[in-house]
Amino acid sequence: MNKPITPSTYVRCLNVGLIRKLSDFIDPQEGWKKLAVAIKKPSGDDRYNQFHIRRFEALLQTGKSPTSELLFDWGTTNCTVGDLVDLLIQNEFFAPASLLLPDAVPKTANTLPSKEAITVQQKQMPFCDKDRTLMTPVQNLEQSYMPPDSSSPENKSLEVSDTRFHSFSFYELKNVTNNFDERPISVGGNKMGEGGFGVVYKGYVNNTTVAVKKLAAMVDITTEELKQQFDQEIKVMAKCQHENLVELLGFSSDGDDLCLVYVYMPNGSLLDRLSCLDGTPPLSWHMRCKIAQGAANGINFLHENHHIHRDIKSANILLDEAFTAKISDFGLARASEKFAQTVMTSRIVGTTAYMAPEALRGEITPKSDIYSFGVVLLEIITGLPAVDEHREPQLLLDIKEEIEDEEKTIEDYIDKKMNDADSTSVEAMYSVASQCLHEKKNKRPDIKKVQQLLQEMTAS
């Protein structure tokens, strides 16, 4: 006979069936991330850092539950059900808390299961009209996309733009990408790459090269969330046009998959060029400085227009034929009238290796973009990816700690593929990166200050 569950019961003693029920409540919308960042060591420090969270996240690809693994790992510290319930209530997971200790849950708490709540919210999500048009020249943008009206703070700050985007049919995009040929471009196919929310293909429209992003639902992303990101990308692009932001040409919403069509970026992403993908020559230090400044200019334009990108990373910094930096991928961007204030979201999104501590707690603030850009600056200096499980330290941002502890210097990490880097400007860029990576968001510079520091670096 099972023993009754009390506040002093160890979490590690909970049976598998109960853990599975808890996971059913917490796994959706990545609720486990909220718990993970709230768990502390006895010293008060965070028990789980970005790397730990990335490891839990990877379990989704194998069909496993991050919540189950989190509770198993935390359970090894002899935490109790009382500790867990306190954490669940603090994060408003009332339904799973009531499974464990019903009397501990406030009587006024809404214990609607999270999956039900998601369904209710999704039914109310606006989505764009699905217009069909025949193929016309890209420059004749006859079909316009009108962002859905909303009274929410996020959409209030977005005025409807008269910018016109072409509405492609899905059939047309299949034709111009050779039926979305999955073979890489290097072997004669059309596939340029893939990311968290879809695959990008090279296409040709009226003798113009374009990039077609076909959105696809990932393991932890619902179809409705994907539609919402499609919608958001178009809204941001309608509002924000700048030399250092990618240019959206059109979209397709009438077929099996949602698609976005962009101006083609012949030099790919900063991530690819830093890794010299496909045998491309390494970027010079001079070129890297130019790219850093361009990316900062793009982020500044977004922030000036009250938008927070939320997924700044080297893979989302694209390079045109002149290696001009173009910020891309605005599906996660948020807008707010109260831009200077921090707002909260139950949906924690972004790329873990670039995420600021507060972003992992669900806070939305422009200072999180600054933190992510700090990681990008480290990539520019070192030529190393933001995360590598076969490297020590595995997270690139942790080299800051090694340098501060005087175990190493930034010279130890400079990309040896460069031959024109001078120590003064490298140290200046590292200083900017270090400021951007401050644990406390209010101690980080704003993007205007980052721009100024980068300009001073190249002028000196």
From Swiss-Prot:
Positions carrying Phosphothreonine: 342, 345
Listed result of changing residue 298 to D: In IMD67; decreases inhibition of NF-kappa-B complex activation; impairs neutrophil migration and phagocytosis
Keywords (A to Z) from UniProt: Acetylation, ATP-binding, Cytoplasm, Disease variant, Immunity, Innate immunity, Kinase, Magnesium, Nucleotide-binding, Phosphoprotein, Serine/threonine-protein kinase, Transferase
Gene Ontology CC annotation, any one: cytosol
PROSITE patterns: PROTEIN_KINASE_DOM (PS50011)
Modified residue annotations for N-acetylmethionine: 1
Ranges where the Death domain occurs: 20-104
GO BP terms: cytokine-mediated signaling pathway; innate immune response; interleukin-1-mediated signaling pathway; interleukin-33-mediated signaling pathway; intracellular signal transduction; JNK cascade; lipopolysaccharide-mediated signaling pathway; MyD88-dependent toll-like receptor signaling pathway
Chief localization: cytoplasm
N6-acetyllysine PTM sites in chain numbering: 34
Effect ascribed to mutating residue 20 to W: Increases inhibition of NF-kappa-B complex activation; decreases interaction with MYD88; decreases protein stability
Annotated Pfam families: PK_Tyr_Ser-Thr
PTM annotation (Phosphoserine): residues: 346
Molecular function as annotated in GO: ATP binding; interleukin-1 receptor binding; kinase activity; magnesium ion binding; protein kinase binding; protein serine kinase activity; protein serine/threonine kinase activity
Domain Protein kinase: 186-454
Quaternary organization: Associates with MYD88 and IRAK2 to form a ternary complex called the Myddosome. Once phosphorylated, IRAK4 dissociates from the receptor complex and then associates with the TNF receptor-associated factor 6 (TRAF6), IRAK1, and PELI1; this intermediate complex is required for subsequent NF-kappa-B activation. Direct binding of SMAD6 to PELI1 prevents complex formation and hence negatively regulates IL1R-TLR signaling and eventually NF-kappa-B-mediated gene expression. Interacts with IL1RL1. Interacts (when phosphorylated) with IRAK1. May interact (when phosphorylated) with IRAK3.
Function comment: Serine/threonine-protein kinase that plays a critical role in initiating innate immune response against foreign pathogens. Involved in Toll-like receptor (TLR) and IL-1R signaling pathways. Is rapidly recruited by MYD88 to the receptor-signaling complex upon TLR activation to form the Myddosome together with IRAK2. Phosphorylates initially IRAK1, thus stimulating the kinase activity and intensive autophosphorylation of IRAK1. Phosphorylates E3 ubiquitin ligases Pellino proteins (PELI1, PELI2 and PELI3) to promote pellino-mediated polyubiquitination of IRAK1.
Homology family: Belongs to the protein kinase superfamily. TKL Ser/Thr protein kinase family. Pelle subfamily.
Illness the protein is tied to: Immunodeficiency 67: An autosomal recessive primary immunodeficiency characterized by recurrent, life-threatening systemic and invasive bacterial infections beginning in infancy or early childhood.
Protein name per UniProt: Interleukin-1 receptor-associated kinase 4
Organism name: Homo sapiens (Human)
